[in-house]
Amino acid sequence: MQSGEFVILLDPIESSSGLTAPRFKYDAVIKTLNPFPPAFDAGKDSIINVCGAGEYNFNNNNLKGFVVSEESADKFLKTVYWLEMEGINFCFLGHISQALSPEIMEGLNGIDVLVFPAGGDPFLDQKTAVKLIKQIQPKIAIPTFYKVPGLKRKAEDVKKFLDEIDASKIEKTEKLTIKKKDIEDTKPTKIVVLTI
């Protein structure tokens, strides 16, 4: 994600995934799944590392983290994030595998862009993902964690989610530029599949 010259890396690709991580300079990293206690990018003091619950502000961007306590354990922490950037409200559901608690849902008002897992087990199943989209009613919903060439872990094709949601607006693109004025009147939710 980029706002001007400021770049945020969301859920960096692990080398064990079988995928090649993109190479670019970033200013902040947000991880929705962290070991506990958290491990940060060693030797990269200028990088902003975000982990866990709380309110953060960097480069005029407001971020709130909500720990998914029913899915966290002694050794790892799952967090859902709400980010306000350039007047647009984003929500990153990350590695969740079940519906969100009422407490977290209450903190996610006015979501413009929802980024959510859509590849099924071990994360959120497609039916629950569709229910969450209908509850949150974002202007844009972006599926993640689905099957792509080279991925070593189990995941289902994004087509399974697309069949489940039966959306009238679906866009496939390599890169997405979002401006507040362009999405203000977007209804129903537009599904955007980022391709690699």
Which residues does each predicted region cover?
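Active-site-proximal loop/helix segments of hydrolase catalytic cores
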Residues: 72-136
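Active-site-proximal beta-strand elements of phosphoester/diester hydrolases
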Residues: 7-11, 62-69, 80, 89-95, ...
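Pre-active-site segment of Zn-dependent metallo-hydrolases
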Residues: 2-49, 67-76, 96-107
